[in-house]
Amino acid sequence: MMESYWPAVARGDEEAPPAMREWAVKLEAKPKYVVSSTRKDFPWTNSHPIAGDLRTSVQKLKDATPDGVLLGSGKLATELDRLDLIDEYKLLVHPRISGHGPTLYESGLARTRRLELISAKPLRSGAVAMHYRRAR
């Protein structure tokens, strides 16, 4: 999992290119907010559980974090989108087609979301980094 890999890279316990190590050190210093109904232990540095009502807790976090909150879970993204709590999407599209595996909104959404393109940047790998804002 990320919580064991990135701290090891930051400490130098895992082999990694310098740019990855630099990213790991920055990530280690950042606050991390965890949504879980089962976990009680959060060993990663600066980890904080989000408890109680998800809508209220995430809205408070958004209000307290004007630069934004990054999330990394398809299930959480689906639920936050359902609660209308996602303002922007940053997507990285790789030049591969997978005929199997999970999709971002595997269980679907209640309605269509209109998005406005903020930026699209092709990367050397062939992937495209795209930034969208919700059209309201």
Task: Show where each model-derived region lies.
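Enzymes that bind and transform nitrogen-containing heteroaromatic metabolites
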Residues: 1-136
